[in-house]
Amino acid sequence: MTMLSKGSRGYQVKVAQSLLILNGCSCGSYGADGVFGSATLSAVRKYQRAKGLAADGIVGPNTWNALLGL
């Protein structure tokens, strides 16, 4: 999977946002809109902290694996 960070856009962002929402991390009032903005950044950091990952706000290999249950 592609690394995602603030400013990323597209289908993979929408997938990551959907998985974050399913795991109880709100991505803001627009939900899974495919735009990695401030609300998604906060959701990623919250999720990473909850999973004991480095809370860098980047959806990289470790965060993808956790989101996908791998």
What does each of the following model-derived ranges do?
Residues 1-34, 39:
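Acidic, Ser/Thr/Pro/Gly-enriched interdomain connector segments
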Residues 16-20, 45, 64:
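N-terminal, helix-rich and Lys/Arg-enriched segments in bacterial and organellar proteins
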Residues 21-30, 45-55:
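Extended, structured, electrostatic nucleic-acid-contact surfaces
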Residues 46, 51-70:
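Extracellular LysM carbohydrate-binding repeats and other cell-envelope/extracellular binding modules
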